[in-house]
């Protein structure tokens, strides 16, 4: 999935990019609000953030919610400011990709987390709380195994970032 997103970013003629998972869990009604805040505050990324910590989220299984919350706390340890680093709904500046593409992992399905961890610049981000809906026709790729693989990758990425 990440490589498909990267291909779309490379081909885009626009300076602002919207990523939105195609599983119908994100409501497009938030796009206008996200873009307005993105422009008003000259942000690098605006994230459609699920209500993971409040538990008011109908779109996640208990395992998926647990793994997502674990990753939120993991990201906080490393001062990455978002309540939803695993979101599949965000707007960002194409220049972030262009300036950092050689540092991105580029595999898997969590492009936002890749951006947040591996960008070589301090990104100005903001979360916008969104409603997140139940998945109807597909299964989540998130599991405990995937959680541990992601943490392992992100730890290695952070170590590289610190020592390079």
Question: Can you describe what each PLM-predicted range is?
Answer:
Residues 113:
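DNA-recognition element of transcription regulators
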């Amino acid at each position: 999935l990440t490589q498909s997103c990267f291909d779309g970013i490379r081909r885009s003629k626009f300076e602002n990019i919207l990523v939105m998972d195609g599983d119908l869990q994100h409501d497009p009604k938030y796009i206008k609000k996200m873009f307005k805040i993105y422009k008003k505050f000259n942000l690098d990324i605006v994230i459609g953030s699920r209500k993971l910590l409040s538990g008011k989220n109908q779109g996640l299984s208990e395992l998926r919610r647990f793994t997502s919350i674990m990753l939120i706390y993991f990201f906080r340890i490393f001062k990455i400011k978002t309540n939803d680093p695993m979101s599949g709904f965000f707007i960002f500046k194409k220049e972030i990709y262009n300036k950092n593409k050689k540092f991105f992992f580029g595999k898997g399905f969590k492009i936002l987390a890749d951006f947040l961890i591996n960008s070589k610049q301090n990104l100005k981000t903001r979360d916008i709380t969104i409603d997140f809906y139940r998945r109807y026709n597909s299964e989540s790729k998130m599991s405990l195994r995937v959680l541990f693989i992601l943490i392992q990758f992100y730890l290695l990425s952070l170590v590289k970032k610190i020592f390079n």
